[in-house]
């Protein structure tokens, strides 16, 4: 039964000693102690450090193999935008949406569209559905 327990990872060196300004150190420092004993907190910090290093290495690998990271890219774009520009954009967008959300009735549809043969405004016909394009299964 003793082999079922997951062994603790071997951590060689400390991240704090290698680079005290690294982003992982900042994330490690915000780990709350809550009601853990100092020994439990030390073990939790070590395990969290292993997780952060693994996550950081995986993110670096994904970034180099698959291009830019979307989350990092979006955060960079948001940082470059001014807060006043964001509020102005949201106000203009809400005004644009409120004017464009009026639903046209059938009477406002141009007569050139309603008089076209084969044009169905009521909905898709059965020949246009995806199910009709499927091949029958062989038995």
UniProtKB/Swiss-Prot annotation:
Subcellular location(s) of the protein: Virion; Host nucleus
Main location per the UniProt record: virion
Ranges annotated as biased composition (Low complexity): 100-120
BP terms from Gene Ontology: viral process
Location of region: Disordered: 100-139
Keywords (A to Z) from UniProt: Capsid protein, Host nucleus, Virion
Pfam families: Herpes_capsid
Cross-referenced InterPro entries: Herpes_capsid
Entry GO CC: host cell nucleus; viral capsid
Family: Belongs to the herpesviridae small capsomere-interacting protein family.
Quaternary structure annotation from Swiss-Prot or TrEMBL: Interacts with the major capsid protein/MCP.
The protein's role, per its UniProt record: Participates in the assembly of the infectious particles by decorating the outer surface of the capsid shell and thus forming a layer between the capsid and the tegument. Complexes composed of the major capsid protein and small capsomere-interacting protein/SCP assemble together in the host cytoplasm and are translocated to the nucleus, where they accumulate and participate in capsid assembly.
Name recorded for this polypeptide: Small capsomere-interacting protein
């Amino acid at each position: 039964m003793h082999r079922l327990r997951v062994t603790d990872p071997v951590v060689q060196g400390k991240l704090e000693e290698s680079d005290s300004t690294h982003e992982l150190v900042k994330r490690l420092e915000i780990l709350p102690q809550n009601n853990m004993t100092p020994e439990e907190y030390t073990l939790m910090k070590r395990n969290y450090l292993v997780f952060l290093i693994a996550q950081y290495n995986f993110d670096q690998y994904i970034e180099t193999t698959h291009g830019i990271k979307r989350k990092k890219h979006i955060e960079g774009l948001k940082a470059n935008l001014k807060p006043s520009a964001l509020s102005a954009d949201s106000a203009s967008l809400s005004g644009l949406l409120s004017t464009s959300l009026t639903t046209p009735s059938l009477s406002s549809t141009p007569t050139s569209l309603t008089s076209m043969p084969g044009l169905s405004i009521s909905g898709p016909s059965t020949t246009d559905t995806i199910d009709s394009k499927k091949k029958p299964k062989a038995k």
